[in-house]
């Protein structure tokens, strides 16, 4: 099987016998690649007929499913740039979502916004205010004639806000997208039509490229679940791999592994065989070696091999993949000694997980505050360059990080990490750290420590910042017993050496998260400063 040449090459000769199976309320719904390509051609004709011209932006506000796939590829066939937006279902209050949609459309400035017919009334005001036109998927598909034209050079406007809450559009060219897809193909040694299963949402870079564009480029059978389906029943996802003729490749963030551990017991895996599960790519957030080992322990009796765990590092600004562990290599763990240098360790709490070497066409450096390379095994800022790099941002907010991230031909990621024997070990966000005893302490480090105290990983987030001139560490806890608060305060006081401690305890969904599950630390920090996240009277250690 040749490597993917272009994101649209599969539409020229689509296969009728292979495709994507989407999990719905009535079970699996199979769409062959031939059916998807034909529907995408009709969508392209409808978009072109409604006024979309080459180079225009089309925003897709659709759940992960066949409607999204048809709209995404249809917009590309019409010569448009596609910008996927998280659907309202991932937000908990419609008012918050409409405000978010207004901000997003102000960045993307689309010609058309495509959504489900049942959502048109809800989104109408936001789309009109942005000067765009809202159309339903159903109406478009009913009016289209087959059409295709030369695709736009700007393939994607990938919206991202990270922990800040301020949306930015990452400009991903066709060239960068094709380069990264080829790199992923070689890194994972995908071979001929590898079967895969995914649940990450299509509006997220990991779900879009790893869970849709890669399977489509290979015209490989794929099982696609929505994130809510996975959260409610992770066993449904595991069945995609454990039953005969099942998937070989999967992707998920660390919290996905944790969800499996918490929700699936060994007796429910009886009769499954995971020996064909070649790779589960794990990325999108700080990786936890304890979770890696627990996931392996759960599935190993049923044929899962530890070497199938494939830690990876990536970000939308580099299209997706930056580095990843190669096949059949087991994850490597290191910890930082008192001098801040990396030393090998086992899968102990707080250890860093190696995310492999840079993928083809990508170069990684780790530098100090002045941009000079740091010694091997020493923490600095991760800087990325290469053929997969995006062409910069589109943003309505002139924050300093966005203005300086793309410097020359390099990307300053804002992530801390280290290189050891050519392998990248991500540590955390530079903006989510503080100096303690002369060393950088990251919010992720404190969250790991609190999990070891007995806090579920999904129920804790740590915020670091300054209140005036006073450094503060804030622990945001969800649905935890009152007696846990004093233990959390005591541990944080010990780890942060006299930094002021506050604890916020609230119900489920107190912790704001991105659509990929990362805490929105900066957004919550602003709410804390504004008095919207009220701390308990837990005291302030001296």
PLM regions with names:
Residues 489-542:
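Conserved C-terminal "lid"/linker of ANL adenylate-forming enzymes
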Residues 247-251, 263-349, 363, 371:
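Gly/Ser/Thr-rich phosphate-binding loop
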Residues 16-18, 143-159, 165-166, 180, ...:
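Conserved pre-ATP/AMP-binding loop-to-beta segment of ANL
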Residues 7-32, 154-157, 164, 314, ...:
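AMP-dependent adenylate-forming
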Residues 19-65, 69-70, 90-97, 148, ...:
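Conserved AMP-binding/adenylate-forming core of the ANL superfamily
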Residues 2, 354-365, 370-377, 381-440:
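Conserved ATP-binding/catalytic segment of the ANL
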Residues 178-195, 203-248, 263:
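Conserved AMP-binding/adenylation subdomain of ANL enzymes
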Residues 242, 386, 391-392, 414-496:
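AMP-binding/adenylate-forming catalytic core of the ANL superfamily
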